[in-house]
Every structure is written in C-alpha cells, then in structure tokens.
From Swiss-Prot:
Protein name per UniProt: Uncharacterized protein YpfA
InterPro entries with a match to the protein in the record: PilZ_domain, T3SS_YcgR_PilZN
A Pfam family annotated for this UniProt entry: PilZ
Gene: ypfA
Superkingdom, natural source: Bacteria
GO molecular function terms listed in the Swiss-Prot or TrEMBL record: cyclic-di-GMP binding
Residues annotated as domain PilZ: 98-203
C-alpha cells in the first residue's frame, strides 16, 4: 500500500491540541512501518512522539488514492538514520479518504487555465483543497459545467514555488454578490499523487496558522 519514500502525514493530540507532522516512509516489514523523524507542518521543527502514543496516518497509495489509518508509536529505531516505528494495520483497516474530506482553505494563488487549443488564461484562486480549486473569472470568459480544462497552479512551498499541472472538470459557475465577481469551481480529474499530497499539506498549514492567529487575538 505505502511505497518506500512516500510522504506520510501524522495527526496526534498533544496538550489537548491537534498537531500535524510530515515524514517519509523508510521501511515496511513485519506489520511495522518505519518513518523518518517527523517535522511539524507549521514550524518545520522535529517533533517528539512518545511510545504508545496514538496517531492517525495519512498517505497516498500505489493506486494514487489517499488512505488513512489509526496507529500507535512502538518506539525508536537507530540504523543509518533515526526512525520511528509505527504499528501497520492490515489493508482492510485502512480507510479511503473521500474527496469531501479534503481540507479546504482560502488562498490567492496564480493559476493558468488552458482550454483546449485556445490561448491560456491567467487568473487567481480564492479557495483551494487537495480535491479541487475555486477561481475568479474575468468578464467575457465562458465555460460550461462538465467541461475539462488543464490547470497550472503555482503553489508556494518552504524553499521554492511548486508548479502543479492537473486536469480539472468545471463543476459550477456563479456570480458572487459580495465581491461582485464571477467565480468558477473545479474538481481535479487527473493529478499526480505527489502534487495532491503537497496541496493537502499546504491547506493544513494554512488552517493551523489561521487557528493559532485566532487564539492569539
């Protein structure tokens, strides 16, 4: 199910607060998953996970479908690098993550729309998730619900900007009375597993930052 080197996302409770950390799968054997030391998705700092701590693990499988399962920390393993050992449940204990479960966040990102053989259109997103995106439409642009478009999304990461290319299907076009702008929502139909994982981690980071800022106000 999990490929070696695949990104994994961990959720756990610490001091009554939901925390999220990212890591990579290093080895799988004897119903155990070994991962590199995880780092907090917001601070980028290495996190300490105690033995017997319950964690939720999310990953994108070989079939490019996202999955989730509940696990426990079994301990630390020292080899060429330090690793964390997790319980690995059987496949039937892993749950597929449905598209509606993707974390969604407000975000203004540069987006290029490529409608068939026509000239590309540059616009901005206002909302995004690992399952789809919502963009602003300039006056005069017209698309149909169900139409397939190619998108290029510029996603800011810690050290560089990631360019995500994906096929997407138009789901809805509407007029927003608050902004007085036309908007369009799209669902990704073809997207690389690594790009989808990057989008998921980006949305989670923004949500956690938003919550922390709200608590400080």
């Amino acid at each position: 199910m999990i490929e070696i080197g695949e990104n994994v996302l961990l959720e756990y409770i610490e001091e009554n607060e939901l925390k999220k950390a990212k890591s990579k799968a290093v080895s799988i054997e004897n119903n155990e998953l070994l991962i590199a030391y995880p780092v907090d998705v917001v601070t980028g700092r290495t996190v300490i996970l105690h033995n017997d701590m319950e964690v939720t693990v999310e990953f994108v499988g070989k079939d490019e479908v996202p999955y989730r399962f509940i696990s426990r920390i079994k301990g630390k393993v020292k080899d060429k690098l330090q690793m964390i050992c997790l319980e690995m449940p059987p496949r039937e204990k892993m749950k597929r993550i449905q598209r509606r479960q993707y974390v969604r966040t407000d975000a203004v990102l540069d987006v290029q729309i490529q409608p068939g053989n026509e000239e590309e259109i540059r616009t901005l997103s206002y909302n995004i998730s690992a399952g789809g995106i919502a963009v602003v439409l300039a006056d005069g642009l017209s698309f149909q619900s169900g139409e397939s478009l190619r998108l290029i999304i510029r996603l800011p990461e810690e050290e560089h900007t990631r360019q995500i290319e994906t096929e997407a299907v138009v789901r809805r076009i509407f007029n927003d009375p608050k902004s007085e702008k036309r908007k369009m929502t799209l669902e990704y139909s073809e997207i690389a597993a690594g790009d989808q994982q990057a989008l998921l981690q980006y949305c989670i980071r923004r949500q956690l930052n938003k919550r922390r800022k709200a608590r400080m106000e």
